[in-house]
Amino acid sequence: MEEEILRVDGLCKSFVVEKSLTGKISQLLKNEKPEVVNALNNVSFSVKKGEILGILGESGSGKSTLARVLMGIHNADSGSAELLGRKLPGDSRDERMQNLRDMQMVFQDPFGSLDPRMTVRNILLEPIKIHGLKIDGDLEDFLANALEEVGLPKDCLDKYPSQFSGGQRQRIGICRALILNPKLIIADEAVSALDVSVQAQILELLINLKENRGLSMIFISHDVAVVRQIADRIIILYHGNIVEEVDADSLLSGVKHEYSQKLLNAALSLREGK
């Protein structure tokens, strides 16, 4: 039986829609209830060891909210999530730190997610220091090997984020996520800000990391072609609801929900230039 890395059961999250001052006054005068958006509605799924689960949906579908809830940035209204059998985000500080070590995130903006005042060396050392990670052997060799794994040379260590291309910065972000040897990576629109040719290189890197490390991944995107290329299994989100779950090979022929079909048809029309 395949090892289960992550289990999510009945996750729900809602937000009150923020209004302008005028809107708030009007709401009070009319005695109206605040408008609530259900960002996640009874979301359940699991991720196996060495599996890439694609989360596909348009803007506003709840994809990024899901990532933020799993990472502990937002608290769920109800439902539960477990990482390697431990409750997320964790019942104690030690458990929360262990969960953060075992589950890392790669962000959409490779420049905005890196501190421009820090060298690559310090960017990589920061999580090591925060988590008190003990390095066996020479630290310099450890950092050089970490960069090599994501396709970057050792001489990057003393450079700043502004000295790199978008693709190189995303490799640095991936390297930082890997430095703690996590069991699960959440990649939130991790290639959407990159050129198509660079996207392909980063996708290939992520697939290689999965195969070489046995790494599990949640890959979040609005791009049908990208998700189909990288994922083993795909969940389609619509207004916070899972409307479809299919193997990646069955995406083009196996979807049944009306929204899923519209999403695929729109992607095919764009590809054909219609």
Regions found by a protein language model. Give the residues of each.
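A short, proline-enriched helix->beta-strand linker immediately N-terminal to the Walker B motif
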Residues: I179-K183
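Helix-to-loop junction immediately C-terminal to a conserved catalytic motif
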Residues: M71
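Conserved ABC ATPase "signature" region
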Residues: I25-Q27, D138-D155, L264-N265
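Conserved ABC transporter NBD signature motif
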Residues: G79-G90, N99
